[in-house]
A protein has these predicted regions:
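Short glycine/serine- and small hydrophobic-enriched flexible loop segments
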Residues: 23-28, 132-140
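Glycine- and aromatic-rich loop/turn segments at beta-sheet edges
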Residues: 119-120, 163-166
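A generic alpha-helix surface/boundary motif
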Residues: 19-20, 132, 148-149
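Active-site-flanking alpha-helical
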Residues: 22, 150, 159
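Active-site-proximal loop and beta-strand segments within enzyme catalytic domains
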Residues: 1-126
């Protein structure tokens, strides 16, 4: 049976923790919600969007209509694909494998930035890897590793001594 001191894996509950951590930095004036993520993550400066196929079935790409903003990343409207379908963007995501568990956040970002967007930033909601990009933004903006930032600014002040990443 579960007790007050039972230790469990919290899995997706890291998403709200990550959101809180990023918003702490916003409250401190470290960034604006409408800042392009490329300001902090330059690898995302020239994102491409799938533009269909030509008469021969070759996939075409075009420049995204605008930069991805931190607001887009916070609300899953950045246009990031995932491995859930067979569009060209999904296939490229699967090949780049940004979410592999052996990658650190910096490598995840480098790989994700090579994947064309599924749609233009802000165009629609699509669930995916955005919380990982939020964690990478936390590292870049705070200058601390993500796990260290969250421990110092969220878990320790709340007395959550047994909560951590591994």
């Amino acid at each position: 049976p579960m007790r007050r001191d039972t230790i469990i894996q919290i899995f997706s509950m890291t998403k709200p923790v990550t959101g809180v951590a990023l918003m702490q930095l916003w409250e401190q004036g470290k960034f604006g919600l409408d800042d392009p993520i490329a300001t902090y993550l330059p690898e995302f400066a020239n994102m491409q969007t799938s533009a269909g196929t030509d008469a021969n079935g070759v996939v075409r790409y075009r420049a995204a209509s605008r930069h991805i903003t931190i607001r887009d990343v916070m609300r899953h409207t950045a246009g990031f694909a995932n491995s859930g379908a067979e569009t060209p963007a999904h296939v490229a995501y699967t090949k780049a494998d940004p979410s592999a568990l052996d990658h650190d956040l910096a490598e995840m970002g480098r790989r994700l930035a090579t994947v064309p967007l599924l749609y233009d930033p802000g165009e629609r909601w699509y669930y995916g890897i955005a919380p990982d990009v939020q964690a990478l933004l936390i590292e870049k903006i705070s200058g601390q590793p993500y796990a260290a930032y969250v421990k110092q600014h969220i878990f320790d002040p709340l007395g959550m001594k047994d909560t951590a990443w591994r």
